[in-house]
């Protein structure tokens, strides 16, 4: 059995509900939601938490529109690929959009949205590696850089609540147990989304550069390929997903995720 291990919870990318521009006359609302298993459930759970719908008992992080037990507002749901949600906003009344897709579309999840997840969300983004690599010097160095105050300050300043740092007691960016001289000249490769993951990693890159370590950031726009290149050994780590997605990926692909936090 292949294994990918989550080694670090860095930030929560808030899920938010944005108003669309549809001019249609209808007694019902149309809301676009992500069509992948974990983010659709995430959207439905947010709508339930805000009182728009009620899900069947037991429906959790795998919920779909078929699990809606009560729909008092007669909402119609359009299931859309997550990356395309900003593009369909003009055709629906509302859309539930992940921050990593909202921000590049010039949508501010804090200022422009009607509803937004809080920092207690269980969908915090993690750094994942292939099992056996979670305690290698390179990964420990990357982990320390991402857990730094410099990264936390960047997240809080840059995204103003759209992305929330969840690292407790951020440090100086360095692991006192590591021999950084031995790491000098080495390269760490990480798969990431363009926004915000690659931007956050760019700050970690500056920290690692102080010790002569190169951080190579490989940008991806889909969720699947980053895990594939980590599993194959082409890339050291993946910083582009949350635990519920990894659990679903595990079920579909025979991988197994073990959190070490």
Language-model-derived ranges and their functions:
Residues 81-82, 90-93, 97-103, 194-195, ...:
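Beta->alpha turn/N-cap motifs
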Residues 16-20:
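C-terminal motif of bacterial Sec signal peptides marking the signal peptidase cleavage site
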Residues 41-44, 48, 138, 146-167:
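Periplasmic-binding protein-like
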Residues 59-87, 217-228:
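Short helix-initiation/N-cap motifs at beta->coil->alpha
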Residues 29, 52, 72-76, 90-97, ...:
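Alpha-to-beta junction loops
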Residues 89-91, 104-116, 248-260:
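Ligand-binding "clamshell"
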């Amino acid at each position: 059995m292949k294994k990918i291990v989550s080694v670090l919870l860095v930030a929560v990318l808030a899920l938010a509900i944005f108003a669309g521009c549809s001019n249609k006359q209808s007694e019902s609302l149309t809301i676009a939601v992500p069509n992948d298993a974990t983010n659709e459930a995430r959207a439905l759970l947010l709508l339930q938490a805000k009182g728009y719908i009620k899900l069947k008992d037991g429906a959790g992080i795998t919920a779909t529109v078929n699990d809606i037990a009560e729909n008092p507002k007669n909402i119609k749901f359009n299931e859309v690929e997550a990356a395309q949600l900003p593009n369909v906003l003009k055709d629906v009344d509302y859309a539930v959009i992940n921050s990593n897709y909202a921000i590049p579309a010039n949508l501010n999840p804090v200022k422009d949205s009607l509803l937004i997840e809080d920092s207690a969300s269980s969908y915090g983004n993690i750094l994942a590696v292939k099992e056996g690599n979670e305690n290698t010097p390179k990964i420990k160095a990357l982990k320390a850089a991402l857990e730094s105050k410099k990264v936390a300050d960047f997240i809080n300043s840059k995204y103003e609540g759209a992305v929330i740092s969840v690292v407790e007691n951020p440090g100086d960016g360095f692991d006192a147990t590591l021999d950084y001289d031995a790491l000098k000249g080495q390269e760490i490769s990480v798969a990431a989304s363009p926004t915000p993951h690659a931007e956050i990693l760019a700050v970690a890159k500056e920290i690692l550069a102080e010790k002569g370590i190169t951080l190579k950031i490989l940008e991806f726009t889909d969720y699947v390929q980053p895990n594939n290149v980590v599993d194959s050994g082409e890339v050291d780590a993946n910083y582009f997903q949350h635990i519920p997605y990894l659990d679903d990926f595990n079920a579909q692909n025979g991988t197994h995720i073990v959190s070490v936090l």
